[in-house]
């Protein structure tokens, strides 16, 4: 099946230019600056939901990772507004969405390391997972107050 490109490079370039962002069609990695995140959030957060800038920035990086790492899974073609709306939708579900996702991904990485009997990777992912769980626990405790 021939799958069309629903969001064209020209459209992404147009939006980036209008938003005064670098051309996101040329992104080689998922890094997003605080200024870029602020610009995107100001466009998509029309209801002025209280979103910490770092949470939004981190979400953009996670969502952009799909396209920068896996070309065949680039849902948004790195379109800043469409990507930002995906982040906003997840944060509306739960503000700790991306911390929960990080824990789940690290649990998967740890499982693969254990399965391969690579003890260096096991130790590395165990440390990362412990840190991610601690951060999530802090967020949950703060939200429970």
Region locations from a protein language model:
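Flexible, glycine-rich loop/tail regions that form catalytic "lids" or insertion modules at the edges
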Residues: 34-70, 81-84, 96, 107, ...
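Generic structural marker for isolated residues within well-ordered, non-membrane alpha-helices
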Residues: 12, 37, 87
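Intrinsically disordered, low-structural-confidence terminal and linker regions
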Residues: 1-19
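Short linear, low-complexity motifs centered on an aromatic residue
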Residues: 101-123
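Long amphipathic alpha-helices with heptad-repeat character
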Residues: 110, 122-125, 129-139, 143
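Charged, low-complexity interaction regions
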Residues: 24, 49, 71-77
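Non-catalytic nucleic-acid-binding interfaces of large nucleic-acid enzymes and RNP effectors
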Residues: 29
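Amphipathic alpha-helical packing elements
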Residues: 74-109
């Amino acid at each position: 099946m021939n799958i069309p490109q629903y969001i064209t490079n020209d459209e992404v370039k147009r939006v980036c230019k209008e938003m005064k962002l670098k051309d996101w069609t040329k992104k080689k990695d998922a890094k997003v600056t605080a200024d870029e995140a602020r610009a995107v959030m100001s466009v998509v957060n029309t209801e002025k939901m209280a979103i910490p800038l770092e949470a939004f920035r981190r979400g953009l990086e996670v969502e952009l990772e799909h396209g920068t790492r896996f070309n065949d899974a680039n849902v948004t073609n790195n379109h800043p507004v469409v990507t930002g709306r995906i982040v906003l939708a997840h944060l509306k579900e739960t503000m700790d969405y991306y911390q929960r996702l990080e824990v789940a991904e690290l649990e998967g990485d740890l499982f693969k390391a254990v399965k391969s009997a690579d003890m260096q990777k096991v130790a590395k992912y165990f440390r990362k997972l412990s840190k991610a769980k601690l951060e999530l626990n802090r967020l949950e405790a703060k939200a429970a107050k």
